[in-house]
């Protein structure tokens, strides 16, 4: 019985001791500049730009006992304040609208994932993924 109590105290001590180290290694939820691809059906090229997106660590808890009567809500790093910008894709055919609107993160927050504005899947595509030919904003092909 004493061994179990001492083991629990040691585990608790290590958690308290290592928590500041763990927190300092993880980036907080904040806007970061990221390579993002912009493409549209009907246009043959994918434009690659740098834009602020929300990224970082949000504290979450996974309950040990999962009750069928309670719901677990996981918080993710997502947009708090956002501005939308428009850019023109090159080489689009004359009958298609070459303009694409994309979000620019002004501030971020740890909150529930909004399926209307965010990709809430576990294994999503990277922000710079392109289906069509990639073109950098300075005109160089990838």
UniProtKB/Swiss-Prot annotation:
* Domain of life, per lineage: Eukaryota
Q: Which residues form a coiled coil?
A: none
The record's section on InterPro entries has:
Cystine-knot_cytokine, Glyco_hormone_CN, Gonadotropin_bsu, Gonadotropin_bsu_CS
Annotated Gene Ontology cellular components are: cytoplasm; extracellular space
Kindly state a single biological-process term from the GO annotations of this entry. testosterone secretion
Q: Which Pfam family, giving just one, matches this sequence?
A: Cys_knot
Q: Which SUPFAM superfamilies does the UniProt entry name for this protein?
A: Cystine-knot cytokines
Q: Which cysteines are joined by disulfide bonds?
A: 29-77, 43-92, 46-130, 54-108, 58-110, 113-120
Signal sequence residues: 1-23
Among the GO molecular function terms of this UniProt record, one is: hormone activity
Q: Where in the cell is it found?
A: Secreted
Q: Which PANTHER family match?
A: GLYCOPROTEIN HORMONE BETA CHAIN, LUTROPIN SUBUNIT BETA
Self-association state and partner proteins as the record states: Heterodimer of an alpha and a beta chain.
Function field:
Involved in gametogenesis and steroidogenesis.
* Family of the protein in this entry: Belongs to the glycoprotein hormones subunit beta family.
Please give the name of this protein.
Answer: Gonadotropin subunit beta-2
What species is given as this protein's source? Answer: Oncorhynchus tshawytscha
């Amino acid at each position: 019985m004493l061994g179990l109590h001492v083991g629990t105290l040691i585990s608790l001590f290590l958690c308290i001791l290592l928590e500041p180290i763990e927190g300092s290694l993880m980036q907080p939820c904040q806007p970061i500049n990221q390579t993002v691809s912009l493409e549209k059906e009907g246009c043959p090229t994918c434009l690659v730009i740098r834009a602020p997106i929300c990224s970082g660590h949000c504290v979450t808890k996974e309950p040990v006992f999962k009750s069928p009567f309670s719901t677990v809500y996981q918080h993710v790093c997502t947009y708090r304040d956002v501005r939308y910008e428009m850019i023109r894709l090159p080489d689009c055919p004359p009958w298609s609208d070459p303009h694409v609107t994309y979000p620019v993160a002004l501030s971020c927050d740890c909150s529930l994932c909004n399926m209307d504005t965010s990709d809430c899947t576990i294994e999503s595509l990277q922000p710079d993924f392109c289906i069509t030919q990639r073109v950098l904003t300075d005109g160089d092909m990838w």
